[in-house]
Each structure stands twice: as structure tokens, then as C-alpha cells.
Amino acid sequence: KDFYVYYARMIETNKYLNLTGITDMKEVVVKHMIDSLSCYDSEIIKSGMTIIDVGTGAGFPGIPLAIYDRSLKVTLFDSLKKRLTFLESVIDKLKLTNCTILHGRAEDLSHQDYRESFDIATSRAVARLPILLEWTVPYVKEGGYVVALKGAIYEEEVKESNKALSILKATIEEIR
């Protein structure tokens, strides 16, 4: 039910605020909801973990993760206040007390308070992997994870990421 309420609110808001080009319910379920939940791995994600969803946009994957596992503490991070206003309305409607929002740009040093504060950083369709790593790794605690939901053509981005991985003292553990 919560996933449908989220979908309906997104489609209604999409009439005046461009949140997604995909509006057909079946396509939204497959391309947004299921894709977002594909990063949920119970071997990595444990009860009560903190997640920052960098460049959350319409809330993917953060909102589906927060609905699926209400023990997670999810911070939805985006640079566009209008999108965050939409997400606040979803959070209120669904009573997602495990969600908060953060306004700003990931690359800004003004978010020093949030550095190394999260168990996991997620991001979907935001930037090429080398840039994405620079924007997400600093927010993750030592021993934490960055989950980058990338498309089918990711190999080149992985190769381009070696310098960023070295500078950030990070490694790629798994690719699925």
C-alpha cells in the first residue's frame, strides 16, 4: 500500500515538477521501485543502519528502502529544494519517521558535519562513477559501503575510477 501511495503522489506532483519521465505504473514498479530495492542485501544492510541517498531526486532508492525496512535511518540528500518539498510530503503521508532530508550539494565542504557519519551511501543515476565516489565516499564511516546503482554499461566507469579509489582509500568489493 505504501509503495502505491508513493507512486500516486509522485505522479500527481510530476504534473508540475519534473520528477520522472517514467509514469506508467508497471514501468515505475520495475524501473524505479524494484531497481531501488535491488541494492538491499541483508548480508550488508543490518537493522538500524544509517543510509544517505546522495542525489535522491524523486527519492530513489531512499524512499523504497525506508518503506521496505523501517529500521533503517535514511537521509535523502538533494540540491533541489522543490524535490525535497515533495519528499517531505511523502515522508509525512507515509509516516516515515525513519527518513530525514538534507538540502545541499554533495561536493560542498559545508557538509563537514556529515562526513564519515553513515554506514552506507546510495546513489542512482547521478554521475559517472569516479565523480560519484568523490561525492559519496566522504560521507561513509570507515568500513562502510557505497552502493552505486549503475546501468548495464558500467565497466568503463569502473576502469576510470582507479584514481578516485586510490585517493579516497576505497575499494570496489563487489559488482552485480
Protein language model regions, located:
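Residue-level signal for inorganic ion chemistry
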Residues: M10, L65, K150
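Conserved beta-strand elements of the Class I
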Residues: I52-V54, I120
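Class I SAM-dependent transferase core
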Residues: D2-I52, T85-L102
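Short, glycine/charge-rich beta-strand/loop segments that flank catalytic centers
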Residues: G55-G57, K81
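S-adenosylmethionine
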Residues: L72-T75, S79-R176
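Conserved SAM-binding loop of SAM-dependent methyltransferases across substrates and taxa
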Residues: A58-S71
